[in-house]
């Protein structure tokens, strides 16, 4: 089930963008938004406020990838760091495996999702390296879910 809604920040000045129109597309994204909003070490944050061009290997066309988050934060040593964050289920970060009972259609769809994600993340890593940013993929493990 997909969850979508508008997040209303408690600290709108920390948000870089339109703080009245912060859209989450999953409960995991909403949880991360709440973390960014309320954590005093997060100095600034944004959600889907910029895009990165990438080559879609399934169509051989240049597409736009909108990373889930950008954060500027103070690390444990009080250094200021900047990261681009993607929130994804662990299963979408791993190469799909054929299992008993998995349909051919499901396997094809999972494979397409996987190769597109890999292309997006490769472009994001290059984009971030050029700008001295970190790129992180956060799964249910990092978000403390399940």
Spans of features found by a protein language model:
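Electrostatic, structured charged patches in enzyme active sites and in nucleic-acid/phosphate-binding
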Residues: 1-146
């Amino acid at each position: 089930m997909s969850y979508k809604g508008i997040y209303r920040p408690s600290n709108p000045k920390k948000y870089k963008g339109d703080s009245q129109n912060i859209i989450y597309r999953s409960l995991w994204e909403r949880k991360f938004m709440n973390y960014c909003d309320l954590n005093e070490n997060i100095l600034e944050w944004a959600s889907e406020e910029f895009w990165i061009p990438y080559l879609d290997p399934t169509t051989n066309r240049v597409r736009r990838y909108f990373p889930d988050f950008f954060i500027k934060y103070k690390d444990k040593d009080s250094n200021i760091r900047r990261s681009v964050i993607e929130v994804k289920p662990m299963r979408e970060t791993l190469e799909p495996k054929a299992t008993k009972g998995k349909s051919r259609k499901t396997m094809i769809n999972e494979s397409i999702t996987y190769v597109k994600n890999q292309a997006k993340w490769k472009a994001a890593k290059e984009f971030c390296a050029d700008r001295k940013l970190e790129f992180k993929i956060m799964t249910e493990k990092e978000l403390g879910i399940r």
